[in-house]
């Protein structure tokens, strides 16, 4: 990479850090190309991205962002997993780490908050934003459904009684 390419990459990475809801930093030493491609595709399907960057360039890109506090995590062969949804990157990274012992999560950030390895794992256990929205809609619509059932119940009971009398009249 020449200087202009490095400058452009740092600018792009800085923008990615600014837009991301969460960032996960991990060591990937020893992973095969197939495993890395698997991680990238899983992260992409979930709405996140994985980027391998030189530590020096990543540290420069972190300057002036909310995630600047994680600069110390960039030692050795590190990769960056990030997503706009704060739950996506940690969830995919933790799931991938369960099956690949050479993938070691170092920590991360969510906005201005630095995350330890345990914090990343606990964040991964939370439901995604879409799952939370679905639960909220379910909680709101359930009482309305029950009210409709209660209001319609007497009419249904009357109809069943009339139906029973009609059946009795036919058999008698």
Curated annotation (Swiss-Prot):
| HAMAP family with a match to the protein in the record | Ribosomal_uL10
What functional role does this protein have? Answer: Forms part of the ribosomal stalk, playing a central role in the interaction of the ribosome with GTP-bound translation factors.
Q: Which domain of life is it from?
A: Bacteria
| Any matching Pfam family | Ribosomal_L10
What are the alphabetically sorted keywords of the record?
Answer: Ribonucleoprotein, Ribosomal protein, RNA-binding, rRNA-binding
Give the record's subunit note: Part of the ribosomal stalk of the 50S ribosomal subunit. The N-terminus interacts with L11 and the large rRNA to form the base of the stalk. The C-terminus forms an elongated spine to which L12 dimers bind in a sequential fashion forming a multimeric L10(L12)X complex.
MF terms per GO, please? large ribosomal subunit rRNA binding; structural constituent of ribosome
Q: What is this protein called?
A: Large ribosomal subunit protein uL10
Q: Which family does it belong to?
A: Belongs to the universal ribosomal protein uL10 family.
A cellular component term from Gene Ontology for this protein is: large ribosomal subunit
Designated gene of the protein = rplJ
Return one Gene Ontology term, BP aspect: translation
């Amino acid at each position: 990479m020449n200087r202009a390419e490095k400058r452009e990459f740092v600018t792009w990475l800085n923008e990615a850090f600014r837009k991301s809801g969460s960032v996960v930093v991990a060591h990937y030493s020893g992973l095969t190309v197939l495993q890395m491609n698997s991680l990238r595709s899983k992260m992409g399907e979930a709405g996140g991205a994985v980027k391998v960057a030189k530590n020096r360039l990543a540290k420069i890109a972190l300057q002036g962002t909310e995630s600047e506090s994680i600069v110390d995590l960039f030692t050795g062969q590190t990769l960056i997993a990030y997503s706009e949804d704060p739950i996506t990157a940690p969830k995919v990274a933790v799931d991938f780490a369960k099956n690949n012992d050479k993938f070691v999560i170092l920590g991360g950030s969510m906005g201005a908050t630095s995350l330890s390895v345990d914090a990343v794992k606990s964040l991964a256990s939370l439901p995604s934003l879409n799952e939370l929205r679905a639960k909220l809609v379910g909680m709101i619509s359930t009482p309305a459904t029950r009210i409709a059932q209660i209001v319609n119940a007497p009419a249904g009971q009357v109809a069943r009684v009339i139906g029973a009398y009609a059946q009795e009249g036919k058999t008698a």
